[in-house]
Amino acid sequence: MTIKVAIAGASGYAGGEILRLLLGHPAYASGELEIGALTAASTAGSTLGELMPHIPQLADRVIQDTTAETLAGHDVVFLGLPHGFSAEIALQLGPDVTVIDCAADFRLQNAADWEKFYGSEHQGTWPYGIPEMPGHREALRGAKRVAVPGCFPTGATLALIPAVQAGLIEPDVSVVSITGVSGGGKKASVALLGSETMGSLKAYNTSGKHRHTPEIAQNLGEVSDKPVKVSFTPVLAPLPRGILTTATAPLKEGVTAEQARAVYEEFYAQETFVHVLPEGAQPQTQAVLGSNMCHVQVEIDEEAGKVLVTSAIDNLTKGTAGAAVQCMNLSVGFDEAAGLPQVGVAP
């Protein structure tokens, strides 16, 4: 049986990264996976070669308009659409179609949080696409609807969830994530112009205003016996892609560096895409570039009485498209790691 895949929002950064990964997927090489409709609103009528010269295999494919009719007849549909648009399309697709949404529309469980941060009516919650979270891999196997996590919540959750679950820390965390400009998407923006970003760092959506704040709190709260307070600060850096996250929290009394390291090594021992670095090594965005990996380091600041966890991911791969393909693999029964690079690009 051949699985036919469509990508809505194919000309965006996330859509292009999904295409790159699918073209390297063993199921594509064997004919078990076929790439069908490629759609987008603003670039409909253009060829993929005009928009994405790094994907010559599909250069002649014409981008179609994003409609439910165009996406009909596919087994899997990836949605790389702006927040709010995904729900509109998803609700028109049949229950037998596997829909994997890279937007935020179905991530949050709390309707009030959705309405506060996104300003529209909450459309519900789908199985959440971080397989490394306790219980999530099982929920994703065979799932027909999947909410791909946000890029910042991915880095923050993988950094902190072992410590929260093991009760190493107080439920009050501070997260700072430095991100590349591709996280802002392809839409023209003065704030993302090279002349505005090169040689400069800038915090934005501070003091709890960023939309990913409730998502991080939701994830950590799943493994905590009480709500987790999250202070989240994103920082824009002059990088095309990558997220470096540093997370701190007060330690519970008596927790040692050895205990913390043992918790992380055990938690991620069987995880293909999370690597706990040796003592003294630090995560680097370059080391995970183009891969589906998350590199993690855990340390104890004894003077401050805090844990310090650092993580690095590629925001377009493990932070979006890689997670989407990982979830597709689980949903349709492929090997979970199929088509997903475990080695970064260096230098």
From Swiss-Prot:
Its main location: cytoplasm. GO terms for cellular component: cytoplasm. Keywords: Amino-acid biosynthesis, Arginine biosynthesis, Cytoplasm, NADP, Oxidoreductase. It is an enzyme of class 1 (oxidoreductase). InterPro entries: AGPR_AS (IPR023013), AGPR_type-1 (IPR000706), NAD(P)-bd_dom_sf (IPR036291), NAGSA_dehydrogenase (IPR050085), Semialdehyde_DH_NAD-bd (IPR000534). Disulfide bonds: none annotated. One of its GO terms (biological process) is L-arginine biosynthetic process. It is found in: Cytoplasm. Catalyzes the NADPH-dependent reduction of N-acetyl-5-glutamyl phosphate to yield N-acetyl-L-glutamate 5-semialdehyde. Belongs to the NAGSA dehydrogenase family. Type 1 subfamily. This is N-acetyl-gamma-glutamyl-phosphate reductase. It comes from Corynebacterium glutamicum (strain R).
